[in-house]
Amino acid sequence: MPGIVLIGAQWGDEGKGKATDLIGTKVDYVARFNGGNNAGHSVVVGDESYALHLLPSGIINPNLTPVIGNGVVVDPEVLFEEIDGLESRGIDCSHLKVSEAAHIIAPYHRTLDKVTERFLGKHKIGTTGRGIGPAYADKINRVGIRVHDLFNADHLHDKVEASLHQKNQMLVKLYNRRPIDVDQTTEELLKLGERLKPYVANTGLILNKALDEGKTVLFEGAQATMLDVDHGTYPFVTSSNPTAGGACTGTGVGPTKITRVIGVSKAYVTRVGEGPFPTELLDESGEWLRQQGHEFGVTTGRPRRCGWFDAVVNRYASQVNGLTDIVLTKLDVLTGLKEIPICVAYDVDGERHDDMPTDQAAFAAAKPIYETMPGWDEDISDCHSFDELPATCQAYVKRLEELSGCRISAIGTGPQRDHVIQINSLVD
């Protein structure tokens, strides 16, 4: 009954897609449990690269069942674009299962997301504009539309009417926009529902039955710990729970069925959008990391903010998620540096903090306290065991492990699928 949770331990873009694909060859199901198509990730198989936003990374593997859980907000138009794109390249998506209880991102959610960000001006959150936040807001306000609502015209019309009642008032009176037509929106959603229906299932039942039968389920988180709406750098966060606890609420599987929690961390740190970032590099070092690591968003194309490894963040992620293992990615990007700084603590108003401040004002004021490790020049992409790595590279990894408080069980040494060193098994 192995239930394995895979989450990001930083601010996202850690390489979870590659880690999922690595583990996915040994599991029976891969289930996404949070977020929406704001979560871009790339999977490289041989010479082929697949950019995914909504589909689980495991969709590439024909021998497992990919699942979109109830905690995900689903934009049907984006889902069909991804399915069509993969099938045009010979990838069969017919085995996909979508939770009947997942909430839908409707066209008006995207509209609201964009106009709200413009209205907020300098106070904007820095969303992707894809309707994620408004869809989750509707879920909490109990006016959301779920997948199973798309199959009954009268019921759906009532749901759309209820959802748009307040939104149209806001659009007209606050944002000076035209109201959204209820009938037209209902018709659009009904058509989307017709195509979605073959994929729809009671995914909670499917996953629990699989675990009871001794099959292995990988729970794939989108975004990351520091973007969690409860545990991240609020308010500069996503609208869901990308932490390990979200795997349970986002799929309908109980916590006693989770046997392992794996966090993915880059060998440095990146962030997209607004919000505090203590180790951010605004100089040529940051630009060097950005270019060497190809740090541009899969979803938005935006350049990512780059900084040195933050051990305080990783310790916090280990604590919040109960990490059992860390997958360290993009270690190869650091090749060529003479010295590599590691943030081991923060200076907040002259006082040392070894742990994450809960006060976001304090976190925004935090200055990194660094220790420096020697770098290496050797190409590590052909290394297949930890002992083959340069001695200074090994020392860097061991220090990150010590500071994070969790063992590093796999290391990414390059962009290809086989550019990885496995130290400990990730699947029991």
Curated annotation (Swiss-Prot):
GTP binds at residues 12-18, 40-42, 304, 330-332, 412-414. Homodimer. Binds 1 Mg(2+) ion per subunit. Signal peptide: none annotated. The active site is at D13, H41. It is an enzyme of class 6 (ligase). This is Adenylosuccinate synthetase. It comes from the Bacteria. One of its GO terms (molecular function) is adenylosuccinate synthase activity. It comes from Bifidobacterium longum (strain DJO10A). It catalyses: IMP + L-aspartate + GTP = N(6)-(1,2-dicarboxyethyl)-AMP + GDP + phosphate + 2 H(+). The keyword GTP-binding applies. Belongs to the adenylosuccinate synthetase family. Plays an important role in the de novo pathway of purine nucleotide biosynthesis. Catalyzes the first committed step in the biosynthesis of AMP from IMP. Pathway: Purine metabolism; AMP biosynthesis via de novo pathway; AMP from IMP: step 1/2. PROSITE patterns: ADENYLOSUCCIN_SYN_1, ADENYLOSUCCIN_SYN_2.
